[in-house]
């Protein structure tokens, strides 16, 4: 593979803020990691440790412990996408720990970056789908009763994954492993300036602005309908339910905004900051942290969308109790078997 500094133009080097041509040490992979890079690694590690068990538990409960329904299919696919997001974190931590050196080869570079955006798009689209489903349930309940079926929901989920694949095609096409020096290579998207701005703008509009507007609007309609119906039945119960709905709406909207907005803003800052700027290194590190913050949304989704539901909490409590009882019974059985075996051995020796 040719040296990157010789095959890329000055415009492309400036576009990606590549300073490695000047600063990579001939004998190694770059400078020693500083406190900020270590903080980013710790942040990634925490998201991995929290996100994997939480989403794996949701996948297990919605996939194997709950009756098949439209809602369980939404949450199963959302948890599966979030679980895959969190499982990819160690592969992103390795280049971060090696000063952005990519050690996995060109095929893994293209596949990982493409699948990463596919899964992230899928997670966002599923959040929009869940919001639209709640909107339809309160706006057209009769239509939902006639047409809202698990089989149709399964095909909708397939369509969501295909749309996410369509949105991630640029990553599969343009991302490549490039050699910066004899001892360092990076996994980068080799766009032109025009295509980079177009791709980033489209990702911002389709991956953040439209989903955020949809999520907020749908949940606000749900809250308005719930508050309008709070006049029916016991006042305190209805008022408490309305407040609970409002808290969920605020939590869902804020988590989506706070987790995704910084990443999209920093995408634009990375493109607009000259590579010789004194702020370039800090912006790159901030972009790394913003990407991890977007992963935090995968940790929060099980709590916000699933665990707040009473039916799910009952199923998860029942499942955990069954697991605990099974482990306890198995331990007792092993102890009794060991005890009886020891007694028989002693009798034979007497």
Curated annotation (Swiss-Prot):
Q: Where are the transmembrane segments?
A: 38-64, 70-93, 111-132, 155-174, 198-223, 248-270, 288-308
Q: Which SUPFAM superfamilies match?
A: Family A G protein-coupled receptor-like
Keyword annotations of the record: Cell membrane, Chemotaxis, Disulfide bond, G-protein coupled receptor, Glycoprotein, Membrane, Receptor, Transducer, Transmembrane, Transmembrane helix
Where does the protein principally reside?
A: membrane
Q: Which InterPro entries match?
A: Formyl_rcpt-rel, GPCR_Rhodpsn, GPCR_Rhodpsn_7TM
User: Where is this chain glycosylated?
Assistant: 17
**Any ranges marked Extracellular in the topology annotation, and which?**
1-37, 94-110, 175-197, 271-287
Q: Which GO terms describe its molecular function?
A: complement component C5a binding; complement component C5a receptor activity; G protein-coupled receptor activity
Concerning Gene3D superfamilies, the annotation shows:
Rhodopsin 7-helix transmembrane proteins (1.20.1070.10)
Q: Where are the disulfide bridges?
A: 109-187
The free-text tissue note of the record is: High expression in head, kidney and posterior kidney, lower levels in peripheral blood leukocytes and spleen, low expression in brain and gills, heart, intestine and very low expression in liver and muscle.
Membrane topology of this protein: Multi-pass membrane protein
Pfam families listed in its UniProt record: 7tm_1 (PF00001)
* Compartments in which it is found: Cell membrane
Q: Which GO terms describe its cellular component?
A: apical part of cell; basolateral plasma membrane
| Residue numbers on the Cytoplasmic membrane side | 65-69, 133-154, 224-247, 309-350
Annotated GO biological processes are:
chemotaxis; inflammatory response; mRNA transcription by RNA polymerase II; phospholipase C-activating G protein-coupled receptor signaling pathway; positive regulation of cytosolic calcium ion concentration; positive regulation of epithelial cell proliferation; positive regulation of ERK1 and ERK2 cascade; positive regulation of granulocyte chemotaxis
What exactly does this protein do?
Receptor for the chemotactic and inflammatory peptide anaphylatoxin C5a. This receptor stimulates chemotaxis, granule enzyme release and superoxide anion production.
Homology family: Belongs to the G-protein coupled receptor 1 family.
Q: What name appears for this protein in its UniProt entry? A: C5a anaphylatoxin chemotactic receptor 1
Which source organism? Oncorhynchus mykiss (Rainbow trout)
């Amino acid at each position: 593979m040719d040296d990157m500094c010789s095959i890329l133009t000055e415009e492309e080097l400036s576009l990606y803020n590549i300073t490695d041509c000047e600063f990579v040490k001939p004998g190694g992979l770059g400078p020693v990691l500083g406190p900020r890079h270590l903080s980013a690694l710790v942040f990634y590690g925490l998201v991995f440790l929290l996100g994997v068990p939480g989403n794996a538990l949701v996948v297990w409960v919605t996939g194997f412990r709950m009756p098949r329904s439209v809602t369980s299919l939404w949450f199963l696919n959302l948890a599966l996408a979030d679980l895959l997001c969190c499982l990819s974190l160690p592969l992103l931590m390795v280049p971060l720990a090696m000063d952005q050196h990519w050690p996995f080869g060109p095929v893994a570079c293209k596949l990982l970056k493409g699948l990463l955006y596919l899964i992230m798009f899928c997670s966002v689209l599923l959040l929009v789908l869940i919001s639209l489903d709640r909107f339809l349930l309160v706006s057209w309940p009769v239509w939902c009763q006639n047409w809202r079926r698990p089989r149709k929901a399964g095909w909708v989920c397939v369509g969501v994954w295909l749309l996410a694949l369509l949105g991630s095609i640029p990553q599969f096409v343009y991302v490549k492993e490039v050699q910066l020096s004899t001892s360092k290579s990076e996994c980068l998207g080799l766009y032109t300036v025009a295509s980079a701005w177009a791709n980033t703008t489209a990702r911002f509009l389709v991956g953040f602005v439209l989903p955020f507007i949809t999520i907020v609007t749908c949940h606000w309609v749900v809250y308005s309908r719930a508050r309008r119906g709070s006049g029916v039945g016991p006042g305190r119960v209805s008022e408490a339910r309305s407040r609970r709905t409002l808290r969920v709406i605020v939590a869902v909207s804020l988590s989506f905004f706070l987790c995704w907005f910084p990443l999209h803003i920093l995408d634009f800052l990375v493109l607009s900051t000259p590579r010789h700027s004194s702020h370039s290194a800090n912006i790159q590190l901030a972009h790394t942290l913003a990407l991890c913050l977007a992963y935090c949304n995968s940790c929060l989704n099980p709590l916000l969308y699933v665990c707040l539901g009473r039916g799910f909490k009952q199923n998860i409590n029942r499942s955990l109790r069954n697991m605990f009882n099974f482990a306890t019974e198995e331990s007792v059985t092993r102890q009794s078997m060991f005890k009886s075996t020891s007694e028989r051995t002693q009798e034979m020796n007497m």
